[in-house]
Amino acid sequence: MKTPELMAIWQRLKTACLVAIATFGLFFASDVLFPQAAAAYPFWAQQTAPETPREATGRIVCANCHLAAKEAEVEIPQSVLPDQVFEAVVKIPYDHSQQQVLGDGSKGGLNVGAVLMLPDGFKIAPADRLSDELKEKTEGLYFQSYAPDQENVVIIGPISGDQYEEIVFPVLSPDPKTDKNINYGKYAVHLGANRGRGQVYPTGELSNNNQFKASATGTITNIAVNEAAGTDITISTEAGEVIDTIPAGPEVIVSEGQAIAAGEALTNNPNVGGFGQKDTEVVLQNPARIYGYMAFVAGIMLTQIFLVLKKKQVERVQAAGQLDF
């Protein structure tokens, strides 16, 4: 005979199991039905390279999914002082009149994203350290650390490219006086930035933002168009029929009866985005060196002034001596 306590525990267990199953089912279904929606944006780098987004060769891992090379820029001060808030401005230029192929095959605007690798100790400045101007420039932006123990590696995106072609990162420099692991000196800064969707998923599968090519040599005998599922292109070869499936999005540029060679394009290339990298440097300046330099310059200026005054004095003495003579 079941007691009320056991019945209550049993009901809670059943509820927890149902919630877990529903959650997993929703996650799996969304990944299967809409795999392109979140593909090839900065957070995918966290999945494929959890330790660091920068390979030993210097390449940012985002380039594995975004195959087209595009321009990217980052502007930061040449040098900063300890515990200073400054702007790192990332520029991701592109032609805003162009639209990209979305996951469902329709056209839409481009999103942008970026990963900014700052030196150790540098991080996104807390809100209470931002000026009113900087708060306005970063309004609506959400910056995320690449990993819990890597505050200096920051990712953002996907966000609207029409609104954020320039992204302002509010950065706080470290203070060697409070952090003994930090030293004054010159440090490297690495940027990876993309606009638009990628061509390859982290699993290695191609997205619909690609140019698709024939898998065999032969003659195209049938082109079956399904607006929702894509297009099936049947190629008759010496070994039989081969069907190449083109997802919705790319435009088919071949016709029935056309001879085709393996590797020849079946569609246009719909990709209008791409990925870019930029490396730069920043100097964490020791204030004592600045004060010393200022004192040195002031000393030189005073010395020059004294020399000029002394020269004038000597000239007056010489002039007076000549008059007496």
Swiss-Prot record:
BP-aspect Gene Ontology terms: photosynthesis
Pfam families assigned to the protein according to its UniProt record, in alphabetical order: Apocytochr_F_C (PF01333), Apocytochr_F_N (PF16639)
Gene Ontology MF terms in the entry: electron transfer activity; heme binding; iron ion binding
Record flagged with keyword Iron-sulfur: no
Keyword Transport in record: yes
Cofactor note: Binds 1 heme group covalently.
Topology relative to the membrane: Single-pass membrane protein
Predominant place of localization: membrane
Signal peptide boundaries: 1-40
SUPFAM superfamilies linked to this entry: Cytochrome f subunit of the cytochrome b6f complex, transmembrane anchor (SSF103431), Cytochrome f, large domain (SSF49441), Rudiment single hybrid motif (SSF51246)
Domain of life, source organism: Bacteria
Cellular component annotations (GO), alphabetically ordered: plasma membrane-derived thylakoid membrane
Transmembrane segments: 290-309
Gene3D superfamilies: 2.40.50.100, Cytochrome f large domain, Single helix bin
Localization: Cellular thylakoid membrane
Record: residues binding heme: 41, 62, 65-66
Keywords for this protein: Electron transport, Heme, Iron, Membrane, Metal-binding, Photosynthesis, Signal, Thylakoid, Transmembrane, Transmembrane helix, Transport
Function: Component of the cytochrome b6-f complex, which mediates electron transfer between photosystem II (PSII) and photosystem I (PSI), cyclic electron flow around PSI, and state transitions.
Record text on subunit structure and interactions: The 4 large subunits of the cytochrome b6-f complex are cytochrome b6, subunit IV (17 kDa polypeptide, PetD), cytochrome f and the Rieske protein, while the 4 small subunits are PetG, PetL, PetM and PetN. The complex functions as a dimer.
Family: Belongs to the cytochrome f family.
Listed name of the protein: Cytochrome f
Native organism: Picosynechococcus sp. (strain ATCC 27264 / PCC 7002 / PR-6) (Agmenellum quadruplicatum)
